[in-house]
Every structure is written in structure tokens, then in C-alpha cells.
């Protein structure tokens, strides 16, 4: 294991493992989740193994892992703090792909719950990264933020749309904090990355929600809205990386008042 990113990878793997253990105890079994091929516009292909029953929707999840590996191995002129933040985010992407693939493969409620739950701390991490740019290295603040993010999934136990409410709040917080960071320290380059990231996020949401409606059009009958929503999701990951690392690799735009690790 590369020592430069090994610690971050272990932290993400352990946290994800603890979430999996919690889910498999059954504490979230009452959460409303969509399970079954009928929720996807891509029709399952007879004769293919279960893990490839919807081949395009399944294989696109490899893009998360490839993106995570790519960013884990990127270096650049970064201090220990920014490198750790980058590596945690990359490890999240790397491990998120297999979780989503497991959900498609098994069509198991608990796999769907785990997929939902792990989405929240992923959206919370850019907020933590922006706080680092503004306030410096505060690991307990970042840990507290992630714990609050994970705890917010409890809303799914209280209401059928609780997860959507929690996710919406995470998206608003991430975009709002990114806008604040750009306003204080940004450039035309960071503005481009931010705009592309927000557009990718909108594409992710709209294409996923309109999966079945879009399937009426020939363009979306083979590669469906769900497939393209995952492409947009990977792109928003990538543009978030570009936006956030821009401030660490271009000292001109780095906040002058923040303490670095």
C-alpha cells in the first residue's frame, strides 16, 4: 500500500465497514428504498449473470473506481493536509463504485440502504475541504462534520422521503460552501470547475429522476437516463477534485490566513 495515501484509504475503508455492519444488523430495515429491476429503464438481459443483468448500468460503476485510483496516485505541490483530504475523497470514490454495483447485482434492500447512506458523507467531504481552505487543519471539525452527516440518515427512519431531504441539504451545503470559497479565493479557472461541477450535479439528479420518461426517446433506450446520471455523478466527483485541488496547487489563490498542516 502506498504510504502517501494508505492512511486515508484505511480510514475510509474502516468507516465504510462500520456503516456496513450497522446496516446489516437491520436497524435501517424500515427505510424506504427502491428495489427491483422495474425501477430501472434498462431491461435485464436474459442469460447474463446477475452481476451483469443490466450491463451498462452495472459496468458504469467501474468509472468511480478508476476515478478514485487516478486521483489517489496524483501528487502535485500539496502539503500533508490537502493531500490527506484529496486521498480521502479519492478513496470514497474508489469504494463507492463497488457498493453501487452490489446494489444492482443483488437488488437487496440492505445494499440499497448502504448505497444511500454512504452518499451523504461523500457530499459532506467537499464541505470539510472548503472549511480547511478557510480555517486551516482542524481534524476534529472534519470528523464531527462527517458524523453529523452520517447521523442525518436517521431522517430516513422518520419519513419515506427523509433520505431525499438529507441529500438535498447536503447538496445545498456543498454548493453553498464551494460558492463561498470561490468568492473569497477564486479565479476564472475555479469558476469554470465550479460551474461544470454544478451542471454535472444537476444532470445527475435530473437524468436519474427521469430514467423511465427518457426511455421513450431512442437516444436513451440503450444507454438510459440512469447510466448517464452515473456518468454525470463521476464528472461531478472529478470537477470537485479539480476545483478543490486548484486552491492547493496554485498558491496565488490559496487563502493567506488559513493555517496549513
UniProtKB/Swiss-Prot annotation:
InterPro entries: TMEM187. The chain crosses the membrane at residues 8-28, 43-63, 88-108, 113-133, 140-162, 190-210. Signal peptide: none annotated. It comes from the Eukaryota. It is a multi-pass membrane protein. Pfam families: TMEM187. GO terms for cellular component: membrane; transport vesicle. This is Transmembrane protein 187. Keywords: Membrane, Transmembrane, Transmembrane helix. It is found in: Membrane. Ubiquitous.
Amino acid at each position: 500500500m502506498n504510504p502517501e495515501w494508505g492512511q486515508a484509504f484505511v480510514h475510509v475503508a474502516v468507516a465504510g465497514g462500520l456503516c456496513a455492519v450497522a446496516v446489516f444488523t437491520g436497524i435501517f430495515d424500515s427505510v424506504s428504498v427502491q428495489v427491483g429491476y422495474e425501477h430501472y429503464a434498462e431491461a435485464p438481459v436474459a442469460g447474463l449473470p446477475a452481476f451483469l443483468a443490466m450491463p451498462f448500468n452495472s459496468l458504469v460503476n467501474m468509472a468511480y473506481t478508476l476515478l478514485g485510483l487516478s486521483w489517489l496516485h496524483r501528487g502535485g505541490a500539496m502539503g500533508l493536509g490537502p493531500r490527506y483530504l484529496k486521498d480521502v475523497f479519492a478513496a470514497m470514490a474508489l469504494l463507492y463504485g463497488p457498493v453501487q454495483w452490489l446494489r444492482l447485482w443483488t437488488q437487496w434492500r440492505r445494499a440499497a440502504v448502504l448505497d444511500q447512506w454512504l452518499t451523504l458523507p461523500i457530499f459532506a467531504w467537499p464541505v470539510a475541504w472548503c472549511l480547511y481552505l478557510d480555517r486551516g487543519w482542524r481534524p476534529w471539525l472534519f470528523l464531527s462534520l462527517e458524523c453529523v452527516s452520517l447521523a442525518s440518515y436517521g431522517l430516513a427512519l422518520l419519513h419515506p422521503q427523509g433520505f431525499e431531504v438529507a441529500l438535498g441539504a447536503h447538496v445545498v451545503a456543498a454548493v453553498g460552501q464551494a460558492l463561498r470559497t470561490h468568492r473569497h479565493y477564486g479565479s476564472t479557472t475555479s469558476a469554470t470547475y465550479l460551474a461544470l461541477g454544478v451542471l454535472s450535479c444537476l444532470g445527475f439528479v435530473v437524468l436519474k429522476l427521469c430514467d423511465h420518461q427518457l426511455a421513450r426517446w431512442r437516444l436513451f433506450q440503450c444507454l438510459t437516463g440512469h447510466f448517464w446520471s452515473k456518468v454525470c455523478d463521476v464528472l461531478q466527483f472529478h470537477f470537485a477534485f479539480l476545483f478543490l485541488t486548484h486552491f492547493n496547487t496554485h498558491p496565488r489563490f490559496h487563502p493567506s490566513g488559513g493555517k496549513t498542516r
